């Protein structure tokens, strides 16, 4: 009557396959991950530390000006940025042809590839897919069926990282465990 298509569910996400907010969050199966280190370049490094009390990943970044790693702070409330979900995706990133002087970067989203999903102090290796510009980004399980990853609700940070920096990416389990690195 008002021109609204009632068959469309406005609460169904088209971006990720989220666990419904009224269900218990799922526990990731890939192991513990209390520290995450994402290197984008020599001068751009992002870190996440799991805070079990808050149930969030706390974000910090390397600051050349400050001479070290500093908490990333929200200017609106002076609180350190914190995330329920951290998603790291690897793809080809290179200088856009003809724009070398401005260092304009081209990101190959059609590439698809490997990634990691972090939530609840845990990690799962994933794959991701994206076709044409009008197709959605899909996070899929690293299994033969490529089923959608069920992402827990909450604030999410997505890092798209150049394949050249994959060897510098790492995550660490709680104190007694050894480092795990991107494969």
Describe each region flagged by the PLM.
Residues 1-183:
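A surface/extracellular/periplasmic glyco- and lipid-processing/surface-interacting theme
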